[in-house]
Amino acid sequence: MSASDQGAVGEDATGEGTPWHCVVTGALGGIGAAVVTAAKNAGYRVTAVDQTPHGHSAGSDGDGQTGDGKRNGDVAVVGNIPADLPVDYVLDVTDAEAAQTTIDRIEADQGAIDVLIHTAGILRADAALDGDTDAMRASFEVNMFGAAHVCAPVAQRMCERKRGAIVVVSSNAGTTPRAGMGSYGASKAAITAWARNLGLECAPHGVRVNIVSPGSTDTPMLRGMWPAGEDRSADVIAGTPDQYRLGIPLQRLAQPEDIAGACLYLASDNARHIVMHDLRVDGGATLDS
């Protein structure tokens, strides 16, 4: 698909005929990195944001936030990342003040944000029956509050300019219960609901907010849940009836590029009349529940 097909080239937020400026959070993760690559290939000017300037954090779920939801060292650094590193700005999304400062800096340095694709998040495996409130707080700090710290101030700027698109990567676990994923599912349900409310409030200003909800995707996040050295893809595809988990009708895991394509579609002018939509990209795993 060409850049013009994706709507990545045209009048940007300044009214000039230049490539649109797309900011991607969680840019080092499996999905985030695929979004960065796809956006660049589609003709966007891309600004990559992650918690660490290179590689995955220790315990990372593959999208740049540590698996226990805690800060990983000096992560609230803003800007001035060496040019040879893949991340343009370093941000811990749980730090609201740093998020505001980073957004200010990005727009000052790179220009107004036309598109935001927020992929940052963590995955914790914990049972709701355990009532582990620490796990709940950790999941919500990143998956819910972290998204709000980034998306709300960007949306405010877009509303002032009367244009823009935001895509929030959530999960099909936000709408379909998963045994052993209590805090993760709850946090994703929360961000899905919040993003739809944000979309409702932004729509009168010409700003579109949508959600992409992946299913099982072949990323470090998913493989990090399996025993070391084991490939559990076949089990995921087949499903686990004893845990009331359906398999994947399409008989394959999603690839990060599948999720990236959905994100870019919703960000593009091809989706100009779509808002508050939750697009499932899970191979039919939730039977569209």
What are these regions (language model features)?
Residues 2-10, 176, 264, 275-289:
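Short C-terminal tail/terminal secondary-structure segment
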Residues 28:
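Conserved glycine-rich cofactor-binding loop
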Residues 203, 208, 274-276:
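Short, small/polar-rich loop/turn modules that mediate ligand/substrate recognition or access, typified
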Residues 151, 187, 195:
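Active-site helix of classical SDR
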